[in-house]
Amino acid sequence: MATEAFVKPVVPNGHDGYEDEDEDDIPLVFKRNSNTAATTNRPSPINNAMRNSAIGSTKSSPPMRSPLTSPNRSASSSTRSSMMKPALPSSSSVQRSTLKSPLRDDRSVVAKERNGFGKAPSVSKSDDEDSEDDKPLSARLKLDSKEVTKQPSSSGRGSTQQAVQKSNMRPQGLSDYTKKKVLDERAPMSSTVQTKTSVGTSSSKPVHIEQKRPLVNNIDRNGLKPKTEGHSSQAPAKRPLEKGSSSNQSSVKRPKLSEPARPVKVEQGSHISATQDAKGKNLDASKPLRANQATVKEDNSDGDDHVPIASRMKSDSSNNKSSSAKPSSSKMIASSSRTIAQKPNKWVKDSKYSKSSKSLPSGDGQKKWKTLQHNGVIFPPPYKRHGVKILFQGKPVDLTPEQEEVATMFAVMRETEYYKKPKFRENFWNDWRKLLGKNHMIKSLDDCDFTPIYEWYMQEKETKKQMTAEEKRIVKEEKLKQEEKYMWAVLDGVRERIGNFRVEPPGLFRGRGEHPKMGKLKKRIRPCDITINIGKEAPIPECPIPGERWKEVKHDNTVTWLAFWSDPINPKEFKYVFLAASSSLKGQSDKEKYEKARKLHNHIGSIRAAYTKDFNNKDVTKRQIAVATYLIDKLALRAGNEKDDDEADTVGCCTLKVGNVECIPPNKLKFDFLGKDSIQYVNTVEVEPLVYKAIGQFQAGKSKTDDLFDELDTSKLNTHLKELMAGLTAKVFRTYNASITLDLMLSKETRDGDVPEKVVVYQQANKEVAIICNHQRTVSKSHGAQVEKLAVKIEELREQIKELNIDLDRAKKGRTPLMGSDGKRKRNLTPEALEKKIMQTQGKIEKMERDMQTKEDMKTVALGTSKINYMDPRITVAWCKRHDVPIEKIFNKSLLAKFAWAMDVDPEFRFCSSTDE
């Protein structure tokens, strides 16, 4: 897990300078809720006459209904019940019933069904027959099992033969299909319940019909199976669909389950397990279970990271062939993945994760969860005073703890570029002066010397570096112990990891580029600033700071955030606590995002034809919408929003100024503006002649500071995009263009070769996507040193090759090698060994030259953003499988957990293949 005590505050168009932390170092542990309720249905006592008249309605009650029951069963059962007489309770009636007419058989079947789960009538009953109605079904099942066993029989097969004969009795005058349907309806309900509940249940454990079990599989997002609470159960992908009944069940039911398995029976068993929810209610079989969608292959060891996914899949498939009765895990995963691609489950719409927003989150009306429990957030430790004084005009100055804390924030930034920026210093002084007060002796920031505090800070930093490994381990364990309970939430009975559970510490805002608020003080967030969202039945998290309380506690299950507070720099924005990127909700949201982008592929032709047609539209608004849509499609521009005066002056498509676009004849446009996060966007592109003409018309008669699209704003553009396709936004265009570019380039450029060469092909494709999305970064300070170091190593290897060639010539002539450059005598090698060594050294040189070129090409390109947010991970996984590239060469540990849902994709997956409309 992360060792940094702070979480990076995320602010649009700005950041606070803290580095991103890896929040997913600890494997996910999913545990089922052990407090399952095993409820026993107790029928109310009624007399025999009333039972015969109420058989149809009794069988249709939800707790007793089998998923295999025909829709017409209630009607047919009530019709038959009107013709029947009460069944005799004697033991002889059980034996004679198999020799009577079909009508007699109907009566015996109804008598069986009236007694509960299709159990046989007991041999003898007491006079007070209604007294057994007060007993639990499980007790009556045990009693009947004992009584049936005591029946006179020449062998133990007597009861078995009776049950088989009863199940084979068919009413006359019915078609084959109807006979088969009736036989399925008359199957003992206990066998159906056993087939359903035996999955994942120990055979020595009594079966509870309404045992609550979360639908989400307890599968670690890194692909490892966690430990489960309570009794161990079978692995979900390896469970047989049919199993022998529990030892506590009646032996009369055994023949039904011991009959040879038929294809129909297997399908029914699968249907039962797939269409029952945690309470035994029927679900729509057409909707895939989200638990199985994110299932990852279980690894038996940690040492196979170097093995390509395709090879691991082959190994799994060969192992699965050993058992014909157990369905293949890989096939089940693949089928569920294909189902998801065709009809994604709309489980969650909120795709924001640890981001700021200008509006309070509102749900879409759909319930995202049933139960939610967590422990709130963890606050940074209170400030500890160090007592080091700053100098004002050469004299030491005493400061209060609050004043000293802010002064220290400024002093530690002495070696950064912000320290000398006028805007940064101005904003800092304005906020610090308020804490100093009007009568304080410090009157000017320029007369202050923060060197003493900076030197103290560097000493503390050096002291931490000198700590032993044991001391660092103790500190890390203590930090983990304090944070452990805040890392996890329980969502619908499943333990999920929380993403940003730390409240950001106070500090000085930095921002990106020339942000107008850089240097302003970010005040300390307190519990009274935070709103908690939690389940109604869950205990409210205890406030960690004594004497304080939460601002508000909500129970809104239509949203996915756990807590939020106002941003201390931009009060109009809010910061949220969400589940981690590897959680089931976030994974489902990512999957829906990429499926929506794939859906755009089916509409892109008509959309492009529509906006091309409107390039000549007489309506200026429609013409501007058409040109803006063209730019968003071709250049992957963001839509853009109006900015306040105190916000960074960044630009999107709708907010372009006349001065941001230059027309270069005959049909080129040069764009130059500040994009998101104040990153400069400079690009010269060739456009359609009609677009070039329209841009010139939009610029006519305007100054450089006027809006280029004066008749258009973001709301109008978004409304138009949603008319073209449901849910279409500028971000969907960016996701589509990024993913399809990656897919096409990987398919076109990949050639046979070793893994490093294929990785370079992937990085080049990733670079093209990053350029399209304008994902840039500043050149690293260590870039020059790294390249120089590689160049020195390459030169050393070339000198080695020269020496090896000399030794090779001498070896061929039978001479001993010369002395080495270090003055030592070399080994006397054969010419073959020397040639092999030369080839190996040449390979090292080629690899280093390739690495050096890659570093040079990627020095200003940020590959991570597009990989995390815009490129469909299934493209990468499928490519790795097709070309035997270990996925660990492309995705780091955090991305492997985030994209666990994509790991079972088919190797032939293509992003541009057709999807459902």
UniProtKB/Swiss-Prot annotation:
The region called Disordered is annotated at 1-368
Q: Where is the composition biased (Basic and acidic residues)?
A: 102-116, 134-149, 177-187, 256-265, 296-307
Annotated site residues (Interaction with DNA) in this chain: K464, R512, W561, K593, T650, K676, N718, H775, K793
Q: What main location does UniProt list? A: nucleus
The entry's active site is Y870 (o-(3'-phospho-dna)-tyrosine intermediate)
Q: Report the top EC class in one word.
A: isomerase
Q: Which residues carry this modification: Phosphoserine?
A: S301
Q: Where is the Topo IB-type catalytic domain?
A: 582-912
GO biological process terms, semicolon-separated: DNA topological change
Which catalysed reactions does the entry list for this protein? ATP-independent breakage of single-stranded DNA, followed by passage and rejoining
User: Which molecular function term from Gene Ontology is one that the record holds?
Assistant: DNA topoisomerase type I (single strand cut, ATP-independent) activity
Map out region (Interaction with DNA) in residue numbers: 575-576, 638-643, 729-731
Keywords assigned: Coiled coil, DNA-binding, Isomerase, Nucleus, Phosphoprotein, Topoisomerase
Gene Ontology cellular component terms for the protein in this record = chromosome; nucleus
Q: What is its EC number?
A: 5.6.2.1
Q: Where is the composition biased (Polar residues)?
A: 32-63, 89-100, 150-170, 189-205
Low complexity biased stretches: 66-82, 316-338
Keyword DNA-binding attributed: yes
Q: Which residues form a coiled coil?
A: 779-858
**Compartment(s) of residence:** Nucleus
List the PANTHER family hit by this protein, alphabetically.
Answer: DNA TOPOISOMERASE 1 BETA (PTHR10290:SF23), DNA TOPOISOMERASE I (PTHR10290)
Q: Which family does it belong to?
A: Belongs to the type IB topoisomerase family.
Task performed by this protein: Releases the supercoiling and torsional tension of DNA introduced during the DNA replication and transcription by transiently cleaving and rejoining one strand of the DNA duplex. Introduces a single-strand break via transesterification at a target site in duplex DNA. The scissile phosphodiester is attacked by the catalytic tyrosine of the enzyme, resulting in the formation of a DNA-(3'-phosphotyrosyl)-enzyme intermediate and the expulsion of a 5'-OH DNA strand. The free DNA strand then rotates around the intact phosphodiester bond on the opposing strand, thus removing DNA supercoils.
Q: What is this protein called?
A: DNA topoisomerase 1 beta
